[in-house]
Amino acid sequence: MNYTKLLSVSILLLCFLFLSYCSAKKRKMTILIHMTDAQKEFFIKEVVKNFEKENDLKIDVISAPNIDEIEKILLTHPDKISLVKIPFIHSWSLVRKNLIVPLNDFLGNYDLGFFYNDYILTWFGQKDKIQYFLPRKYETRIMVFRKSKVIEAYNSFGKYKDSINSILKQINGYGLPYNYKFDRNPLHWDYYDIFVLGFIWSQLKINGMVMPRVAHRGKKYSGTSLRVIDRIYQCSGDSTAFLGMDGPSVVDAFEWEALYTYANIYNKKMWEEEWSGKNIWEGFASDDVFLSFLTQIDCVYLIGTGKDGIEGYIKDKSDIGMTLMPTGCSVQLDMNGNVLRKGKKSITTGGWWWAIPKSCPDLKLTYRFYGFITSRSVQLEECSRFGMIPVRRDILKNKYIISDNGWISKIFRVSYKQIQINDKNMLPSHINMNRIADIYLNALFDIVVNRNWSSMNSIPVIDTSVNGDSI
């Protein structure tokens, strides 16, 4: 009897040890991300946890503190990372360093066909017909402004027109372009209109303060370099001009940045306090910013949704206008006072990829996880809550995203229209993209922020011979 009991206990103990061993050996994935707190909470609690339950595995989600640290963490983290979320601007550096597994290495033509059929703009993540990246979200910048402050500037234009002409004449030898009229519709604005707005705002005493109130990111990181890169494309540049770092479009881009700084159009705090996106949202709330160029997620946090802890920064949401980017042009005018070089509204389409690192222990499982986190149901929920532009073809045909007149739908409609205007403009898939962007960033800080545009501290004259909100 004692022997039987001992045998039973031994069997139970062995079963327990076996189950413990199996539990310890449960499959594991490690995902590297950079997300806002609200997006991260949604991703972990409402997406990752469901996949864990369905597939009996453990998923660890680790976060990079900023976008410029992602590659470093990927290279140094002790765990084998299965999937990484990477911005366009840093993506090709990973390919150059042979850190990414292309889909072609483990998917056959049949599965690749489904991938290309399900997702849009996949060719953005290709090089030499090899698919390196999987769409996470596409984004672009749009122009965001305070409607009431535009009206105030419009009504004050006559008072300040002579002063505006005077300062511009120092730079282009003429002043405002010939027969210039300040259009009330932001959809028709170009860089000169932004100058006019910014100059007037810099003269007005608002809440007891006189200061410039146009801003963009000013922190020394890749998010700021995109402003200069976008300007190059708006000034009719292309990837050749961008990579060559030369030509009229590059000159025009830097001249406008220098002019806005020289003429006190930009809020100096953006440089002095090294503003990122959050600082701009706060600037709108404190009346330090009346106009900027923001991504979709910027707009969501600025305006707020009332969900996911995203309450917004603006008290009067109806005072926020958003429309397409202004049209680029040259600072320089011809002998008749007309813009010497006309530009476009198009900028670059960017966003974020998912990528499978060489460290991934299970390629097929990771790809199945990617399919889960970009499934129709997950994308519908995530896009409706965070203003993301969907990457699935079937969702773009779904009226749920764009049918109502709410803020999320407005952000989506304007941004998607801007992406359509951008057409094929994207950051080139150059293996040294990181280095090139850094050169532009350093040039911006050297020439513009540090005012090294000439020995006389004046801007050099370089001879290089959707539906908007109607205010």
Which role fits each region the language model picked out?
Residues 21-96, 111, 157-169, 452, ...:
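Conserved N-terminal structural module of periplasmic/extracytoplasmic solute-binding proteins
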Residues 67-102, 114-133, 192-208, 281-283, ...:
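Pocket-flanking alpha-helical
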Residues 88-144, 151-157, 321-325, 331-341:
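Hinge/lid segment of periplasmic solute-binding proteins
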Residues 105-116, 177-180, 184, 233-255, ...:
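Short, solvent-exposed loop/beta-turn-alpha elements that line the ligand-binding surface or hinge
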Residues 130-136, 141, 167-243:
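Extracytoplasmic/periplasmic solute-binding protein
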Residues 195-201, 223-231, 235-285, 325:
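Glycine-centered hinge/linker elements that transmit conformational signals in sensory
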Residues 265, 311-394:
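Extracytoplasmic/periplasmic substrate-recognition and gating elements
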Residues 334-340, 348, 383-449:
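Long, aromatic- and glycine/proline-rich binding clefts that accommodate carbohydrate-like moieties
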